[in-house]
A protein has these predicted regions:
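Non-catalytic structural scaffold of enzyme domains
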Residues: 1-172
Length: 176
């Protein structure tokens, strides 16, 4: 966005959002977004999967339709990218419990013919990443627990549905 000022807000007081109930995440995220819109921002970008899942419909209704402020989130772009690259239509999602329970990714992929989503909540990944534990036996044990069922189900494309995952676990692959 050349020529635009970018304001980054990270809710460090309440992060990580992943372990929080989805209704609490919705309240927290909408409160921050209300302040931003009231201050005159031209666009909202929600870079957290859990926050995106929690506020997706409310944010579009409240800000895009209600006030003309576009809302960009991470769920639909990730779902579209996964649908484009899958070879067998079996897409896996690893995410926080709130993101999985919200069905936001399932809803985003619902209209894509021939695609099946298999979702797994990975709560320990966020906690480990927050503690700086990104390699070692704890991570590998959790990775096997979370990823092996997806591999066994024939998943060929994996959505990393939490921003902690691609930053903290760059070396992980589906187990063979």
């Amino acid at each position: 966005l050349p020529g635009e000022q970018v304001l980054y807000i990270g809710d460090t007081e309440h992060s990580p959002y992943g372990p929080r109930p989805i209704d609490e995440v919705r309240e927290l995220a909408l409160a921050v977004m209300d302040e931003l819109v009231d201050s005159g921002v031209k666009m909202l970008v929600i870079a957290c999967n859990t926050a995106s899942a929690a506020v997706l419909h409310d944010a579009r209704r409240r800000y895009t339709l209600g006030k003309g402020v576009p809302v960009v989130e991470v769920i639909h772009p990730a779902a579209r990218a996964a649908a484009r690259v899958t070879r067998n239509g079996r897409i896996g999602l690893i995410a926080t419990q709130g993101t999985v329970d919200s069905r936001a990714y399932a809803d985003a992929l619902e209209a894509v013919p021939g695609v099946e989503l298999l979702s797994t909540a990975c709560p320990d990944f966020v906690e480990l990443a927050e503690r700086g534990v990104t390699t070692g036996p704890q991570v590998m044990s959790r990775a096997e627990e979370y990823l092996l069922p997806l591999r066994e189900a024939g998943v060929d494309t994996l959505i990393l549905g939490c921003t902690h995952y691609p930053v903290s676990y760059t070396h992980l692959t589906l187990p063979t």
